[in-house]
């Protein structure tokens, strides 16, 4: 299983993606339906045998939009982006720029209703799609994919192996947790039209009189980022627990590990809050 998403209009109704069987639907705590290659808009990667058709329907990156449409990634198929509408009907959006990308981990919508997607595995990167106000007509859409090489503010080119997670902060910037630490896209509005977007590295002064600084979490596998209502950055790592960083990312406010907190492991897979603060 990849992830679950709750129906925003019905907290007893939710969907769960899978790595091969399609999309599971649950209602009132009970299994309701399996959406797969023969009863939905989803496709299988392999179609040579019945077994392969039933076990290679890969679904991830579940996300509802403002109109109640459920978006998802039907990974490793030609038309990766699939949408199930509130009435149960389906459609897909094909983009040549996304063809062949192996796995999408997230689909999120920004304040301007643009779609942001992070690609993982052997072609990691960040994609943005502007639907131009026409949901099912992608002929007028604008799209950009950037990766796996990112240019930072020092004009250094860094090649990443994975984007584990991203999140929007209250200033509109996008913070990305990668296998090489944290990157920040400061100007998402111009990402689609910019042939050379800059992915900023937060610099942490060494404070040793040298005037030198190091990139935030340089060389550290950062597995998750969650930005709270105070605009603070919660950053999960592969083997060093959770760091709570200041709004600008330059100051460590807390560092939680198995030795000083109830964390059962220092390998952090997800971070969220209870919505009460």
Model-flagged regions — what are they?
Residues 18-20, 28, 60, 67, ...:
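Short loop/turn segments immediately following the C-termini of beta-strands
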Residues 12-17, 24, 69-73, 114-118, ...:
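Conserved beta-propeller blade signature
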Residues 3-5, 14-15, 68, 74, ...:
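Long, internal scaffold/assembly segments composed of regular secondary structure
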Residues 6-11, 64-67, 109-113, 168-171, ...:
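Residue-level detector of Asp-centered blade-edge/turn motifs that repeat once per structural unit
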Residues 27-30, 84-88, 130-134, 187-190, ...:
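Short loop/turn segments that connect beta-strands within beta-propeller blades
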Residues 230-231, 235-237, 244-247:
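Long, C-terminal catalytic modules of enzymes
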């Amino acid at each position: 299983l990849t992830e679950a998403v709750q129906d925003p209009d019905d907290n007893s109704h939710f969907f769960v993606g899978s790595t091969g069987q399609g999309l599971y639907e649950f209602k009132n705590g009970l299994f309701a339906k399996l959406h797969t290659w023969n009863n939905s808009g989803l496709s299988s990667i392999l179609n040579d045998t019945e077994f392969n058709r039933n076990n290679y329907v890969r679904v991830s990156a579940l996300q509802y939009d403002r109109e109640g449409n459920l978006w998802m990634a039907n990974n490793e198929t030609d038309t990766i982006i699939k949408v199930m509408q509130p009435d149960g009907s389906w459609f897909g959006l094909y983009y040549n720029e996304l063809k062949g990308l192996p796995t999408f981990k997230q689909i999120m919508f920004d304040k301007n209703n643009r779609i942001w997607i992070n690609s993982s595995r052997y072609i990691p990167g960040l994609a943005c799609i502007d639907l131009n106000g026409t949901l099912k007509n992608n002929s007028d859409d604008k799209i950009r994919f950037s990766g796996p090489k990112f240019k930072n503010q020092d004009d250094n080119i860094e090649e990443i192996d994975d984007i584990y997670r991203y999140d929007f902060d209250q200033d509109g910037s996008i913070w990305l947790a990668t296998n090489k630490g944290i990157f920040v896209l400061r100007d998402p509005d111009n990402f689609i039209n910019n042939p050379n977007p800059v992915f900023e590295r937060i610099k942490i002064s060494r404070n040793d009189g040298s005037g030198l600084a190091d990139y935030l979490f340089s060389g550290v596998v950062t597995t998750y980022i969650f930005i709270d209502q105070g605009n603070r950055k919660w950053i999960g790592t592969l083997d060093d627990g959770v760091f709570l960083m200041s709004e600008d990312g330059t100051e460590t406010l807390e560092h939680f590990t198995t030795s000083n907190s109830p964390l059962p492991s220092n390998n952090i897979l997800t971070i969220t809050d209870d919505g009460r603060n």
